[in-house]
């Protein structure tokens, strides 16, 4: 993706059946349903500078085992991380606002999600 890209629009990877790993650099916003219903994806790495995860931006990815989030997140919609793999690990910078936001989002999930401070 071009370095100048700052926003991943709504539904950018919706239902991407071949997507196995996603590492995006330089973005500030992920729109709604960006990584939704991607059955083969296992890992997502998002860059420092990312400020917002939209509604259900990462959801319904049953084989997703690891998400790496930056310290710069200011907003994470409450519907993120739902319907992903049991045992999902969300890697966050220890003590960051991102860690606080993620812990709040996962409070009501009905399966095992682990926050991994690094």
Indicate residue ranges for each PLM-predicted region:
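Structural signature of tandem-repeat unit edges
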Residues: 1-7, 17-29, 39-52, 62-75, ...
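Consensus positions within tandem repeat domains that build extended binding/scaffold surfaces
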Residues: 9-14, 31-36, 54-59, 78-80
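Acidic, glycine/polar-enriched metal-coordinating patches/loops
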Residues: 84, 105
